[in-house]
């Protein structure tokens, strides 16, 4: 906002800065929108929050009910809930160090990345993650409420990242910082 960044660009960075600008820390911070409720020990709980927060923020809808069942007041049904979730299913979260400090308390940036584009989304019967419906194939589909032309399967394609997008410690600035830290310890 302080840089007079357009809302469209802000949203793009919140959802996909890891692919749009994989080496730009100032833009990568925006993916914190997707990591703010990260649950290390329950991925499904975290993805429920991602689906809910993106729907509230960008569609003006609450999707709590349709995770478990079709609801007469929600414009999306249970299948559409899981189709929306399928857009986020490949995501994982990691912490990229901001300095050469190896301690666990060192400053780091929380960011998302696509770990596995082939991961399958499962519909959980009555929203129970212990009861997935193995018969249904769930694809990433834009909800019908956006019109017939929008309600189609979205292509999810791999984006080739530079090596430092995967391994930020190899970036020239990170290597220089590590060399400086080693030199300080040696002196």
Question: Which positions does each model-derived feature cover?
Answer:
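Short, structured secondary-structure elements
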Residues: 1-114, 121
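Substrate/cofactor-recognition hotspot
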Residues: 82-187
């Amino acid at each position: 906002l302080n840089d007079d960044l357009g809302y469209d660009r802000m949203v793009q960075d919140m959802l996909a800065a890891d692919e749009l600008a994989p080496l730009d820390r100032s833009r990568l911070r925006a993916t914190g929108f997707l990591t703010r409720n990260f649950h290390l020990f329950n991925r499904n709980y975290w993805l429920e929050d991602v689906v809910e927060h993106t729907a509230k923020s960008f569609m003006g809808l609450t999707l709590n009910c349709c995770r478990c069942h079709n609801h007469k007041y929600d414009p999306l049904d249970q299948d559409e809930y899981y189709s929306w979730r399928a857009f986020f299913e490949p995501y994982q979260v990691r912490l990229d160090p901001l300095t050469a400090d190896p301690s666990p308390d060192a400053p780091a940036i929380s960011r998302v990345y696509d770990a596995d584009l082939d991961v399958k989304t499962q519909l959980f019967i009555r929203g129970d993650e212990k009861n997935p419906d193995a018969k249904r194939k769930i694809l990433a589909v834009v909800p019908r409420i956006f019109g017939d032309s929008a309600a189609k399967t979205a292509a999810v394609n791999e984006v080739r990242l530079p090596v430092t997008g995967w391994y930020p410690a190899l970036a020239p600035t990170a290597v220089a910082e590590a060399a400086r830290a080693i030199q300080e310890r040696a002196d």
